[in-house]
Amino acid sequence: MAHGPGALMLKCVVVGDGAVGKTCLLMSYANDAFPEEYVPTVFDHYAVSVTVGGKQYLLGLYDTAGQEDYDRLRPLSYPMTDVFLICFSVVNPASFQNVKEEWVPELKEYAPNVPFLLIGTQIDLRDDPKTLARLNDMKEKPVCVEQGQKLAKEIGACCYVECSALTQKGLKTVFDEAIIAILTPKKHTVKKRIGSRCINCCLIT
């Protein structure tokens, strides 16, 4: 964390498989508008002024590319990070699996002491008929809240938050929780947030 002339500067880096909604997550939050087209990200940066607990912060949001082609380039954005958001799409079970197989190991290698949150994206598609039909054809189904909560506990995430960049449901909570994770390090509980509900679950250590 670096101190500016006014607000406290915080750095938040978003990681996860390609096309799970990382860029949409950031753009919808930073610009209050959902992007119309998908453009694979190499690296991008946004800055948003936010107030949490009556205090103002300048949150630097760093987007990263999830594709394997950028495996060597991506960690260049990791130094001085205050918190990571590991994203997966709730309608892409493979991206959920890769959280544990790829993204957690990568963060443990390059930023072992930095807190991270587990973020389930694209929840607006959970009940979408076309999406459900596509998943059914592959003998798959959307990732449920309980699965996300369980994985968050397994990997040691600060909390599990679900959101939709399209409808903005849960979107503000994602970044409020990210700031809280920075300001209260070494949390020993995982929280599940759905709307206004919050359930605490103790981690087994």
Swiss-Prot record:
Motif position, Effector region: 38-46
Cellular compartments per GO CC: actin filament; cytoplasm; membrane raft; plasma membrane
Lipid sites, type S-farnesyl cysteine: 202
Cysteine methyl ester PTM sites in chain numbering: 202
Alphabetized GO MF terms: GBD domain binding; GTP binding; GTPase activity; profilin binding; protein kinase binding
Binding residues annotated for GTP, in chain numbering: 16-23, 63-67, 121-124
SUPFAM superfamilies listed in its UniProt record: P-loop containing nucleoside triphosphate hydrolases
Keywords: Cell membrane, Cytoplasm, GTP-binding, Lipoprotein, Membrane, Methylation, Nucleotide-binding, Prenylation
Activity modulation notes: Regulated by guanine nucleotide exchange factors (GEFs) which promote the exchange of bound GDP for free GTP, GTPase activating proteins (GAPs) which increase the GTP hydrolysis activity, and GDP dissociation inhibitors which inhibit the dissociation of the nucleotide from the GTPase.
Membrane-related topology note: Lipid-anchor
Gene Ontology biological process terms, A to Z: actin filament organization; cellular response to insulin stimulus; cortical actin cytoskeleton organization; endocytosis; establishment of cell polarity; GTP metabolic process; insulin receptor signaling pathway; negative regulation of protein localization to plasma membrane
Location relative to the cell: Cytoplasm; Cell membrane
Primary location: cytoplasm
Pfam family, one: Ras
Entry-linked InterPro entries: P-loop_NTPase, Small_GTP-bd, Small_GTPase, Small_GTPase_Rho
Propeptide intervals in chain numbering: 203-205
Quaternary structure and partners: Interacts with CDC42EP1, CDC42EP2, CDC42EP3, CDC42EP4 and EXO70 in a GTP-dependent manner. Interacts with ARHGAP33/TCGAP and GOPC. Interacts with PARD6A, PARD6G (and probably PARD6B) in a GTP-dependent manner. Part of a quaternary complex containing PARD3, some PARD6 protein (PARD6A, PARD6B or PARD6G) and some atypical PKC protein (PRKCI or PRKCZ).
Matching NCBIfam families: small_GTP
Purpose: Plasma membrane-associated small GTPase which cycles between an active GTP-bound and an inactive GDP-bound state. In active state binds to a variety of effector proteins to regulate cellular responses. Involved in epithelial cell polarization processes. May play a role in CFTR trafficking to the plasma membrane. Causes the formation of thin, actin-rich surface projections called filopodia.
Protein name, as recorded: Rho-related GTP-binding protein RhoQ
Organism from which the protein derives: Rattus norvegicus
